[in-house]
């Protein structure tokens, strides 16, 4: 674009001298041969402006066209050779200072241009050879490309006598497109209907169909006047039947397409809204869960701290009470068993009582040892995992021992009594068994009486303590 713009400016500068010569030639000979000079001058001028338009240098095109219109159609008789507007008076430039582009300009036509063209009162609707057709067409397109469609419409209304509705067909169609672009649907509808009423007989069939198409599909369809447009087509006497049916069918198809698009847009909007709501709900739920987790963690930590602080005290308070209560119970059991021993005369019951007393004494001694250990180690906490492991190991070892004893017993089973082996085994081992039984009875009796004496001495010493 920059290269084209530079090249355009070079073309414009190179041809400026020729243009000035043409202007001088036109001004010197305008009184004698207006028609011939106008044709030669306009042909050269048109070629130059069209080349500039192709290179998209719209600002130069606008200035050239406005100067040409002013020369050809101005009614001010006091103007001499310098009757065309100056370049400085055509545009209003608003400089905007930016960091990136310090000299950006927005182009707009000055009020002097509109005031000068409001005095033209030009009317050439039936004249197909009028030069304003191609000049205004290029001018409207250039102003649209520059971003000033409203200035183009204002210029058309000022230049022609009765406004847009009294313009040639090409200018009318371009003006209606600009109105549709600016979303002025009511104004465009009024202008088309007025032009059709005024000049219906002067339009060709293709021009008339083009205006009807603009009115129905570009204006009334966007105004959502479907029934009115169908009635207008049905009552139109200038259109052929197949053309009417084609327009009506196309109109229904456009309505269906629009309804389908609107439905899709609604579904998309609903989908987006539901997704947003779901995301919001998920975020809220996540936030609530995070808050709950944080609160639970805090509560758990507080409980752990309280438990850690209260466990040693509870153990210090509870363990002595338990041990003391166990010791008192064991003492009672020992006293009862001693009274039983003194009253017993049978050996079997005496053995049972002695065993009970021994077991109670062991429990008392163990509880005393545990008491001393707990008093010395009050600050150390009991590790439940290690205790469970130890208990499990003991159980496993006991199970192994029991399993081994069972195997040994199974291996040392005596033979069957009625068999010859059993009788031989009994005869061989009878003397040995009798001697072993006598020795065991003597040893057990002596051991039991010695244990009883030792038990009585321990109980009396324990009661003293």
UniProtKB/Swiss-Prot annotation:
It comes from the Eukaryota. Residues 1-31, 288-320 are annotated as: Disordered. Residues 1-15 have a biased composition (Basic and acidic residues). This is Putative uncharacterized protein DDB_G0287573.
């Amino acid at each position: 674009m920059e290269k084209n713009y530079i090249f355009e400016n070079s073309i414009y500068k190179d041809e400026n001298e020729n243009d000035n010569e043409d202007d001088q030639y036109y001004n010197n000979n305008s009184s004698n041969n207006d028609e011939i000079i106008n044709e030669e001058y306009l042909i050269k001028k048109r070629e130059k402006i069209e080349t500039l338009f192709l290179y998209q240098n719209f600002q130069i095109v606008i200035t050239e066209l406005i100067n040409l219109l002013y020369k050809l159609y101005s009614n001010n008789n006091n103007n001499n050779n310098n009757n065309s507007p100056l370049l400085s008076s055509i545009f209003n430039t608003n400089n905007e200072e930016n960091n990136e582009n310090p000299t950006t300009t927005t182009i707009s036509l000055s009020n002097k241009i509109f005031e000068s063209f409001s005095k033209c009162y030009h009317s050439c609707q039936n004249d197909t050879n009028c030069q304003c057709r191609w000049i205004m067409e290029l001018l409207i397109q250039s102003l649209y490309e520059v971003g000033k469609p409203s200035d183009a419409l204002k210029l058309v209304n000022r230049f022609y006598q009765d406004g847009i509705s009294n313009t040639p067909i090409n200018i009318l169609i371009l003006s209606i497109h600009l109105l549709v672009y600016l979303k002025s649907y009511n104004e465009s509808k009024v202008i088309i209907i007025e032009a059709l009423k005024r000049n219906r007989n002067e339009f060709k069939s293709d021009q008339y169909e083009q205006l009807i198409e603009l009115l129905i599909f570009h204006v009334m369809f966007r105004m959502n006047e479907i029934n009115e447009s169908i009635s207008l087509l049905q009552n139109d006497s200038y259109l052929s039947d197949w053309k009417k049916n084609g327009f009506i069918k196309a109109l229904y198809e456009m309505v269906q397409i629009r309804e389908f698009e609107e439905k899709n847009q609604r579904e998309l909007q609903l989908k987006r809204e539901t997704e947003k709501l779901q995301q919001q709900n998920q975020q809220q739920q996540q936030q609530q869960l995070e808050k709950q987790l944080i609160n639970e963690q805090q509560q758990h930590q507080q409980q752990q701290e309280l438990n850690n602080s209260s466990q040693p005290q509870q153990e210090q308070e509870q363990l002595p009470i338990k041990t003391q209560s166990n010791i008192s119970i064991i003492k009672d059991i020992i006293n009862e068993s001693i009274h039983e021993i003194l009253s017993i005369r049978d050996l079997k019951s005496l053995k049972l009582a002695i065993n009970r007393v021994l077991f109670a004494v062991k429990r008392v001694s163990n509880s005393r040892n545990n008491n001393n250990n707990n008093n010395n180690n009050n600050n150390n906490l009991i590790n439940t995992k290690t205790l469970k492991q130890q208990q499990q190991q003991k159980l496993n070892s006991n199970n192994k021992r029991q399993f081994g004893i069972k195997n040994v017993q199974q291996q040392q089973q005596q033979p069957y009594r009625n068999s010859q082996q059993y009788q031989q085994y009994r005869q061989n081992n009878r003397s040995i068994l009798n001697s072993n039984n006598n020795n065991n009875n003597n040893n057990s009796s002596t051991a039991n009486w010695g244990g009883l004496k030792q038990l009585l001495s321990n109980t009396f010493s324990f009661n003293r303590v």
